[in-house]
Every structure is written in C-alpha cells, then in structure tokens.
Amino acid sequence: MAVSYNYGTGRRKTAVARVFIKPGSGNIVVNGKPVDEFFSRETGRMIVRQPLVLTENDSRFDIMVNVTGGGESGQAGAVRHGITRALIEYDAELKPVLRKAGFVTRDAREVERKKVGFRKARRRKQFSKR
C-alpha cells in the first residue's frame, strides 16, 4: 500500500518550496538534510516550525521539503508557506487558525529593480551643485 502524502507549494521572495507531509513522528527533512542542519540560524528553524506549533501538530507529521532559489530567510518563509498549505490540504478546519496567524497569505514583497541612472533601486547619484 502506498503512503499518502499531502502536498503544498510555498513561495517567498525568489524561493520556492515543495512540501510533502505524511503522518509520522515529527521529522523535518529539507533538501535531504535535517532542518536543524539545513537552517544554520535559529530564526530559520523557528519560522519553519511555526504552523506546526500553532496547530499542535509538531510531532504528528514527517515532512519532506525540496526548496530552491533565494537566500536563507526567503527559503524559511517559503517552507513555512508550503507547510501551511499542506496542513490545510490535510485538514481544512485548520485554515481559520492559520489564516488568523497570517501564515496562509503569500508575502508578496519582492526586491525592487535597479533603475538606470540610479546607484540602487531608489538611491540616486550624489548631486553636485558646482
């Protein structure tokens, strides 16, 4: 008999996470590494576990994640978004709780592009009067 996974795609900045959850003991594997090894900062690990802690499912699921693009912060946010979506697919009654905490909404903030004639996105060249 095949094990049934629940799937969720999470995105944040330029990072994309594909999250698969199945009933288990609470193991979280990101790109083949344990979550504590993959995310070197404690904040990244905390962000990833937030939806599970909120819904009190931190030791009920084994989670397998593939994440690409972005940096450490963006990837952590993408994984959180993916876990949230997978939990909702598993049990739709969790949606209002997760929505209230703000985990369901995709954080649409992206890096603003650099403009021609500027040093950065908004930083202009220094003005010289003479």
UniProtKB/Swiss-Prot annotation:
Query: GO CC: one term?
Result: cytosolic small ribosomal subunit
Q: Which GO terms describe its molecular function?
A: RNA binding; structural constituent of ribosome
Q: Which UniProt keywords apply?
A: Ribonucleoprotein, Ribosomal protein
Q: Name one Pfam family in it.
A: Ribosomal_S9
State whether keyword Ribonucleoprotein applies.
Answer: yes
GO BP: translation
Keyword field contains Ribosomal protein: yes
Give the family this protein belongs to, as stated in its UniProt record: Belongs to the universal ribosomal protein uS9 family.
What is the protein's name according to its record? Small ribosomal subunit protein uS9
Organism equals Aromatoleum aromaticum (strain DSM 19018 / LMG 30748 / EbN1)
